Amino acid sequence: MRVADAATKHGISEEDGIYAASFPIWVAPLDDDPAQWRELRLGFDTHARLLETVVVVASDGDELLIHAMKA
């Protein structure tokens, strides 16, 4: 998973954002484009904090973390 610069603006490290987004406990699609869409994901980081993340997912499986903050 790649990480956009904007994903760390709320003080969440790349490692914690990736961990929470990679092991979500809840996922909701934000778009319905079959080629590329955004997903809202809730998951715990490496410090057991619940994070809200937004990931852009491409149809080829590529993922880009664009948002991460404490939920």
List the predicted regions and their residue ranges.
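Ribonuclease/tRNase effector modules and their secretory precursors
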Residues: 1-71
